[in-house]
């Protein structure tokens, strides 16, 4: 069956939209918003009508007939923790997206705009594998400090999309496999996927795991406490050291991994040291996730922007191929992943989950 889908992925200073016929992209647009436009609104939710109008206007400009749409799909926002899958957008979800129960984020607008347009057209609206996807085993939640449980914050949409893609490509099905998925972008998340559930994963935003282009990953916690109480830093300055100015930015003042590798290959010893540590930490975290799966790993999947690297990918492969064979799905296609999530429901392959 043929479905036309409008996909909405709001970012902090832009809104990315795509129109798909099944998995074929008809067109894609990145609608950029100036600081002046964004500053007019006190909260993220206040931007709702402005962003919705911008989307409808571009569709009108392209002479696209929105009455031909089968469903609207939004990027999932900072909801309460949920298991992965495609969710029908309902009133309970809208209320939580409005207030941002786990924090303010532009992606909170994805479901809100999707439902608003969908309701006007009398068609369903969905979100797919939001960033708060949480399928951790109970044992993976304990950190050692009762007040500080481990949290599942990772690249759920892309990790799930490539895991399902490998399930299809291999003919074995995602639900029948044990996979380790490594997303390498601005942050690095390494997930243990056990028969369709991400039973353990590092908190790639501000928790633990390998350092990345912009994030610190796991740090020595005693020294971090001393830093916090040294009187030299505000809370936000310490947080920025962990998220934004950590990793490559902290050591080399750049988040450009390709540029660092180029310098290393031209003989820069400092770049070589940081690159080798980055590779080492990802390797070590893959080993942890192999242990979380009791050594029963069918395949390791590498994805995200850094998975295009002709240097890092072979280096990482040679470090971990003793655990399981490695398949590479470079980059990430969030719009396609959102479309695929809706198609699985419209085709009856999956049932829409209720929030």
Curated annotation (Swiss-Prot):
CDD domains: ASKHA_NBD_BK (cd24011). SUPFAM superfamilies: Actin-like ATPase domain (SSF53067). It holds the Pfam family Acetate_kinase. One of its GO terms (molecular function) is acetate kinase activity. It is found in: Cytoplasm. One of its GO terms (biological process) is acetate metabolic process. GO terms for cellular component: cytoplasm. NCBIfam families: butyr_kinase (TIGR02707), PRK03011.1-5 (NF002834). This is Probable butyrate kinase. Its EC number is 2.7.2.7. Keywords: ATP-binding, Cytoplasm, Kinase, Nucleotide-binding, Transferase. It comes from Clostridium botulinum (strain Alaska E43 / Type E3). Belongs to the acetokinase family. It catalyses: butanoate + ATP = butanoyl phosphate + ADP.
């Amino acid at each position: 069956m043929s479905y036309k889908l409008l996909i909405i992925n709001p970012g902090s200073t832009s809104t990315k939209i795509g129109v798909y016929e099944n998995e074929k992209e008809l067109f894609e647009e990145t609608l950029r918003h100036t600081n002046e436009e964004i500053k007019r609104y006190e909260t993220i939710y206040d931007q709702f009508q402005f962003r919705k109008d911008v989307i409808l206007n571009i569709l009108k400009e392209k002479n696209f007939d929105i009455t031909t749409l089968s469903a609207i799909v939004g990027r999932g926002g900072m909801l309460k923790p949920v298991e992965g899958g495609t969710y029908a957008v309902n009133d309970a979800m809208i209320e939580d997206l409005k207030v941002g129960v786990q924090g303010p984020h532009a992606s909170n607008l994805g479901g809100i705009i999707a439902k608003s347009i969908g309701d006007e057209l009398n068609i369903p609206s969905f979100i797919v594998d939001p960033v708060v996807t949480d399928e951790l085993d109970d044992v993976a939640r304990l950190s050692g400090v009762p007040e500080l449980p481990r949290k599942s914050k990772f690249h759920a949409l892309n990790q799930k999309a490539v895991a399902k893609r490998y399930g299809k490509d291999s003919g074995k099905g995602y639900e029948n496999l044990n996979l380790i998925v490594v997303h390498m972008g601005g942050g690095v998340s390494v997930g243990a996927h056990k028969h369709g559930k991400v039973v353990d994963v590092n908190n790639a935003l501000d928790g633990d795991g390998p350092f990345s282009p912009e994030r610190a990953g796991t740090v020595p916690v005693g020294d971090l406490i001393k830093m916090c109480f040294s009187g030299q830093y505000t809370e936000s300055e310490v947080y920025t050291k962990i998220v934004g100015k950590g990793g490559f930015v902290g050591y080399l003042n750049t988040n450009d991994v390709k540029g660092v590798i180029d310098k290393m290959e031209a003989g820069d010893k400092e770049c070589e040291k940081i690159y080798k540590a980055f590779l080492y930490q990802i390797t070590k975290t893959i080993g942890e996730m192999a242990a979380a799966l009791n050594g029963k790993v069918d395949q390791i999947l590498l994805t995200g922007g850094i998975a295009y690297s002709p240097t890092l990918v072979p280096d990482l492969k040679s470090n971990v191929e003793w655990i399981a064979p490695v398949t590479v799905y470079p980059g990430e296609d969030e719009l396609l992943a959102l479309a695929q999530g809706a198609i699985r429901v419209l085709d009856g392959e999956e049932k829409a989950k209720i929030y």
